[in-house]
Regions:
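Extracytoplasmic small-molecule ligand-binding "clamshell" domains
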Residues: 26-105, 117, 150
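Short helix-initiation/N-cap motifs at beta->coil->alpha
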Residues: 30, 83-95, 141, 159, ...
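Beta->alpha turn/N-cap motifs
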Residues: 45-49, 86-91, 100-112, 136, ...
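Periplasmic-binding protein-like
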Residues: 47, 126-137, 201-246, 265-282
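Ligand-binding cleft/hinge of the Venus flytrap
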Residues: 55-58, 70-81, 147-149, 163-178, ...
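Extended ligand-binding regions for polar small-molecule ligands
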Residues: 67-75, 152-153, 161, 226-269
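A ligand-binding cleft/hinge motif common to bilobed small-molecule-binding domains
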Residues: 92, 108-118, 168-169, 188-224
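Flexible hinge/capping segments at coil-to-helix
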Residues: 123, 135-154
Length: 282
């Protein structure tokens, strides 16, 4: 074969390979296309942790995580009820994503570097932290009063190896009483054995909504951690879509849906997004 013929043959082969590449790329469809074709979203979450994901009196799944899934379903189909929930343990959150058992997981999952190597996190939908709850008619008005009281203050907290260090990060001189259940830490405050309860801000907010006027937030939070949904790595179209749905729920056309959920589960009214220049780009 002459040089010119070999060159022509190579050129033809290269052209055939290049022409086939777009078709091959089109075959690798996004999870977005799969979900749209199926007609409903499949979301992994739990069922035993109020106010995030738990059963109502009539056995319906509800909570803030559940509502985040409904936001995505509404963005997909115009209907927040076009969603199937897969009940899963915390340990199953990542495996169920990587094995395609679910399209997405929203289950008060803390964003960490280690987890981000295994799955793709969406934009955050909540910032958790530790807070302090007081009795409304108690002797301490707020966090400043607690801190000023020094060693006179007793704080009830759920028993764990980090409990002392966690409380002392905010109240260095406080006495720390550890209990085996969440119910007991609240009972300690109610009975007067403790002056304050230290636990997740979301748990305190939920408890206060269930007991209006009886308790109050001390006005200080620490130990921040970010909650985000998780999807499978390597599918930018799907990640972009979910991020868009969550972003617009927190800042745009679906804000009322997000704000209503926030009020229901945390008892707080959110300020509507500022009109004009998008604040997230300042």
């Amino acid at each position: 074969m002459t040089v010119s013929l070999r060159t022509s043959a190579l050129s033809l082969a290269t052209a055939l390979i290049l022409s086939a590449m777009p078709a091959a790329a089109q075959e690798a469809k996004s999870k977005l296309d799969e979900v749209l074709a199926r007609g409903h979203l499949v979301m992994g979450t739990g069922s035993t942790n109020a106010p995030w994901h738990f059963k109502s009196a009539d056995d319906k799944l509800q909570g803030f995580d559940v509502d985040m899934g409904r936001i995505v379903a509404k963005a997909l189909f115009g209907d927040p009820d076009k969603i199937e929930f897969v009940n899963q343990s915390s340990d199953a959150r990542i495996p169920n994503i990587t094995t395609d058992k679910v399209d997405i997981t929203c289950q008060f999952m803390t964003v960490t570097g280690e987890r981000a190597q295994q799955i793709a996190f969406t934009i955050p939908y909540y910032r958790e932290g530790v807070g302090l709850m007081l009795k409304s008619d108690g002797k301490y008005a707020d966090y400043a009063a607690l801190k000023s009281a020094g060693s006179s203050v007793t704080v009830s907290v759920l028993q764990n190896v980090y409990a002392e260090a966690m409380v002392h990060a905010a109240l260095p001189e406080a006495t720390v009483d550890q209990y085996e259940s969440v119910d007991l830490i609240y009972q300690a405050l109610e009975s007067g054995r403790a002056d304050a309860v230290a636990t997740d801000q979301s748990s305190l907010a939920w408890y206060m909504t269930q007991n209006p006027g009886r308790y109050k937030d001390a006005g200080y939070g620490w130990n921040p951690q970010t909650y985000a949904c998780g999807v499978k790595r390597g599918d930018q179209d799907w990640l972009n879509f979910v991020n868009t749905a969550l972003h617009e729920a927190m800042t745009g056309v679906e804000f009322d849906f997000y704000a209503k959920s926030f009020k229901t589960w945390f008892g707080k009214d959110l300020t509507p997004p500022q009109i004009g220049f998008p604040v997230e780009y300042k």
